[in-house]
Amino acid sequence: MHPRHAGSLRIGLVSDTHGLLRPEASAFLAGSDHIVHAGDICDPRILDALRALAPLTAVRGNNDHGAWAERLRGSESLQLGGIMLHVLHDLAALAIDPAAAGVQVVVSGHSHQPRVSRRDGVLYVNPGSAGPRRFRLPIAAAELRIQGRDVTALVREFAA
């Protein structure tokens, strides 16, 4: 169970599952108000499993193929709790100026490296990979906490 403050939203962030949604990642995402998957899903059953936990926004990654993947967009912008998020798989493909577009949070994946940074007033979050281990990179997911106009990000690494 995740502690919740009155009036706050918890947004679960996941990426690069590559056909494997680890139980510890599912447990971490449970209780989210919304889940965002930043691509490289590789199996549509993962989307079903995430939708069973919370409303879902997902984008297509470079390894997502087939009719199910064609229904996903390469990027999505959405507003949650008054905060504008922009989601895409590979940050190198970012085609907007987030600050100029009024985006407060950019969520991406692709690198399998969890990272949280802030540039020009925009919070950038890569939740890392919640799928099969790649090289020596950690298995991870992340969350956004939205409380009014304040947004914080937390990366959670799993022992898997």
What do these predicted ranges mean?
Residues 19-23, 42-46, 63-69, 92-97, ...:
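Active-site environment of divalent metal-dependent phosphoester hydrolases
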Residues 1-84:
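Core catalytic region of metal-dependent phosphoesterases/phosphodiesterases
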Residues 72-75, 102, 108:
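Charged helix-capping and loop-helix junction motifs
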Residues 2-8, 77-81, 118, 125-160:
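Binuclear metal-dependent phosphoesterase catalytic core
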Residues 12, 36, 57-59, 105-107, ...:
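Hydrophobic/aromatic beta-strand patches that form the interior of the parallel beta-sheet core
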Residues 83, 102, 120-121:
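Short coil/turn connectors at secondary-structure junctions
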